[in-house]
A protein has these predicted regions:
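Compact, glycine-rich, soluble single-domain proteins
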Residues: 7-57, 64, 88
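Extreme N-terminal starter segment of soluble prokaryotic enzymes
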Residues: 2-3
Length: 89
């Protein structure tokens, strides 16, 4: 299993559009992908789970990937967060 911590730096945090991008990116990979906030772990391929994290700007999340393409999945998700979900803010 590969993990990496990221900090949400886009202005609105993990709102609906950002959550949708995260879920669709996670779904591109065979590996299981989880996102952890504090003690809450959710499936990153579940829009409801991701939205339930209610993560505002500045929140630190841990992304966990396990499976045959875990390296690629983790790299893609970390890049998405670091790119502010393409929002340019």
């Amino acid at each position: 299993m590969k993990t990496e911590r990221v900090t949400l730096c886009n202005r609105l945090g993990l709102h609906a559009r950002a959550a949708s991008k995260l879920v669709s990116t996670a779904a591109e990979f065979q590996s299981s992908v989880n996102v952890v906030r504090d003690d809450r772990r959710v499936n990153a391929k579940s829009i409801m789970g991701v939205l339930m994290l209610a993560a505002p700007v500045g929140t630190e999340l841990e992304i966990e990937c396990e499976g045959p393409d875990e390296d690629e999945a983790l790299a893609a998700l970390v890049a998405l967060v670091n790119d502010r979900f393409g929002e340019g803010e």
